[in-house]
Each structure stands twice: as structure tokens, then as C-alpha cells.
């Protein structure tokens, strides 16, 4: 029986050496070649999504804190094993759509028990018309819109001066600003005017307009656009109006305008006439419609009766004295009753020839007319 030596010094065979060399070379070739040199690409397998979070490999978990893979919003465990009260959910209010027929957003809801509006009576009388005398002032004429009364104490003729308002008053207690290129003068036609000699209102208006034009516009020029208009006032009063313009020789002056109206009562026994003179320029023209309405609104103003004297007052007869009539009793036969006070009327203008007054000047002295006026020299149209 042969025994193998533990430390054999026998050389290995040739075939064994070749086999070992071949295996070692094949392994080296396999390791040097890339893995995908002769292989198909590998398709990755999809991984289903997961809500769990993988903890960071280097992050240490602190005792008492929730784990990283805990769901967001989950309540933390109560310390010492105590049960934490349930978390109250927060509800978001939602607005329900308005029901059909509801008022739009922002509109107040109608009162459910509100009374419906009363029906309109088809047989109700129409509202009363506007009072045409609503703007009547104590001088008994209707003031034109946009005009105010001015101080007439400085006028040489007439009893009323109207000015056109151009803006609000500067202070509450001050008069408003007025225009300086237009004005209205009113008064009574009496013996101080040359036109009073004309019984015909149309002729009186033409004559008064000529005199007033020479007075207010004493510059050479030509009269143009002349016309006349009849007037029919209240209480049967009638009259006439005359209008013309003056084209001055000085081209720097705007054309002057003048409207003159004469109107009087129809009572032949106590006839009274008044005049209206409306002055203007081409920059601030005369309103013919308003001028006609102003002249036709003039009425003879009768002042209210004087209050009766108090019994026992100065000048009053003693009660029961002879000859003292009872209150309201007619006068005794043969005794003339005291005459009633004369109605107050606008004053009369003075004669032409005085300088044209301006609103706000000091009172001027009244000038009497000369027997024969000197007409203004104007060119024919």
C-alpha cells in the first residue's frame, strides 16, 4: 500500500499546468469586458408609489418625537401614556346659492309685511299750475331769473335798478358780483320824460328808446336791426316795445343794444304807464323774451290798508264823543270821507343828458329836463 507524502517534491504535470493557465486567462477576460458589451439593455421595473418616508440614514431619532414615517397631521402621542383629546376639525363655511327670485347681492331684502304703494287714482285732479306771480316783489313786477335788485338811490330817473348776477357772493353778508355791461332800469312814465307827451304807447316806446339810447350810448354810430313788439300785460294792460342796436364808428367798441317797453293800464280815468329799459351789448346781449315778460308782469301795486288806530291812542276820538262814527259805519251825510292813500308806483326817470350812472355810486341829484331835447346824431341804417 502506497502512502502519499505530506510534502511532496514531485513536479506537477504539464497538462495540469496548462489547465490552470487557461482558466486564469478566461477569468481575466471576463472581468475586463464590460457587462453590456454583448447583452440587451435591462428594462427597469416600476416601483409603486409609497406614502411612507424612508428615514435618513444619518438622522438620529430623538426620543419623544414622532417617527419620520408617521403621517403628516397625525397627533403626537401624549406624554406619560395619557390620552390626548381628539383634534377638532376646522370647517370651512360654504355659501349656498341664492334661491330663485331673491334680490341680487348688496340689495336690501324687501320687507315681507311691507305695504304696497297706493294705486294712482285715475280720477285725481291734476296738480295746480305754477304760480306766475311767485317771483313778484313789492314793486309789483316779476324779477327775471339771474337778476337781483340793486341800489336805485343814485338814479337820476326811474325807481328800480336790476343787475345781472355773474357769480356767488364773496361772503354770506355781501351782495353777489354783477355785470357792468348790462342793466335794467324801470320807472313810471310821467311829466319828467318827453315820451309822456305821446298818448300812443308805440310812439312813446320809440321816443323813449331814442332818448335813452342817446343818454346811455353817447357815441357816434349807426342804428341797425330795429323792430317793435306789442305788449299785453295782466289786468288788461297793453303797451309796445322798441328795440335797436348801435354799430359804433369806433370798431373797438362792441355793438350797443337797447330794448324799451311802455305799458299802461286800460283805465282811462286813472291811467298809469310804466317803462322798462334793458341795456346790453353784443358781448352780453338783451334777452328779448325775458324783457317782454318783465314788462308784462308790471301791475299797479296797492299798499295794504293802514291798521286802525288803537282806542285811546293819540288822535283817536274818545269813546262816545259826539261826531265819532262807530267802527265800520258809513260817513255821515254831507261829510266827506277821508280819501284813500294813492297807490305807490315806480318813480319817473329824469331828463336825458346826465352822465350814465354806474351801480354802487353815490346818489346823484335829480335833473329836470330842458324844454326841448337835442336828438343824437346817428347815421341812417
Curated annotation (Swiss-Prot):
GO terms for molecular function: extracellular matrix binding. Residues 1-32 form the signal peptide. Coiled coil: none annotated. Residues 63-84 have a biased composition (Low complexity). It holds the Pfam family FAP. Residues 35-137, 300-381 are annotated as: Disordered. Its main location: secreted. Residues 95-131, 302-330 have a biased composition (Pro residues). InterPro entries: FAP. GO terms for cellular component: extracellular region. The keyword Flavoprotein does not apply. Keywords: Secreted, Signal. The keyword Secreted applies. Transmembrane segments: none annotated. It is found in: Secreted. Belongs to the Apa family. This is Alanine and proline-rich secreted protein Apa.
Amino acid at each position: 500500500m502506497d502512502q502519499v507524502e505530506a510534502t511532496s517534491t514531485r513536479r506537477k504535470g504539464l497538462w495540469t499546468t496548462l489547465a490552470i493557465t487557461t482558466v486564469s486567462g478566461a477569468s481575466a477576460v471576463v472581468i475586463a469586458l464590460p457587462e453590456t458589451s454583448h447583452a440587451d439593455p435591462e428594462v427597469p421595473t416600476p416601483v409603486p408609489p409609497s406614502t411612507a418616508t424612508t428615514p435618513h440614514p444619518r438622522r438620529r431619532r430623538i426620543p419623544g418625537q414622532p417617527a419620520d414615517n408617521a403621517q403628516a397631521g397625525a397627533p403626537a402621542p401624549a406624554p406619560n401614556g395619557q390620552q390626548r383629546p381628539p383634534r377638532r376639525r376646522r370647517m370651512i363655511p360654504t355659501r349656498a346659492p341664492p334661491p330663485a327670485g331673491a334680490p341680487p347681492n348688496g340689495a336690501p331684502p324687501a320687507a315681507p309685511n311691507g305695504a304696497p304703494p297706493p294705486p294712482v287714482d285715475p280720477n285725481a285732479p291734476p296738480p295746480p299750475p305754477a304760480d306766475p306771480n311767485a317771483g313778484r316783489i313789492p314793486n309789483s313786477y316779476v324779477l327775471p331769473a339771474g337778476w337781483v335788485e340793486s341800489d336805485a338811490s343814485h338814479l337820476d330817473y326811474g325807481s328800480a335798478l336790476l343787475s345781472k348776477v355773474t357769480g356767488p357772493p364773496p361772503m354770506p353778508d355781501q351782495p353777489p358780483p354783477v355785470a357792468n355791461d348790462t342793466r335794467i332800469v324801470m320807472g313810471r312814465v310821467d311829466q319828467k320824460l318827453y315820451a309822456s307827451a305821446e298818448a300812443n304807447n308805440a310812439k312813446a316806446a320809440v321816443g323813449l328808446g331814442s332818448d335813452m339810447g342817446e343818454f346811455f350810448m353817447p357815441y357816434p354810430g349807426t342804428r341797425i336791426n330795429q323792430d317793435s313788439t306789442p305788449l299785453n300785460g295782466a289786468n288788461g294792460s297793453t303797451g309796445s316795445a322798441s328795440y335797436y342796436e348801435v354799430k359804433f364808428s369806433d370798431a373797438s367798441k362792441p355793438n350797443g343794444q337797447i330794448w324799451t317797453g311802455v305799458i299802461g293800464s286800460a283805465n282811462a280815468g286813472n291811467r298809469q304807464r310804466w317803462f322798462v329799459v334793458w341795456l346790453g351789448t353784443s358781448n352780453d346781449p338783451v334777452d328779448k323774451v325775458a324783457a317782454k315778460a318783465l314788462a308784462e308782469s308790471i301791475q299797479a301795486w296797492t299798499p295794504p290798508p293802514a291798521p286802525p288806530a288803537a282806542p285811546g291812542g293819540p288822535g283817536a276820538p274818545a269813546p262816545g264823543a259826539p261826531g265819532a262814527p262807530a267802527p265800520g259805519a258809513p260817513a255821515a251825510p254831507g261829510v266827506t270821507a277821508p280819501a284813500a292813500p294813492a297807490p305807490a308806483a315806480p318813480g319817473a326817470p329824469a331828463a336825458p343828458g346826465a352822465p350814465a350812472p354806474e351801480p354802487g355810486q353815490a346818489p346823484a341829484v335829480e335833473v329836470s329836463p330842458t324844454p326841448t331835447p337835442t336828438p343824437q346824431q346817428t347815421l341812417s341804417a
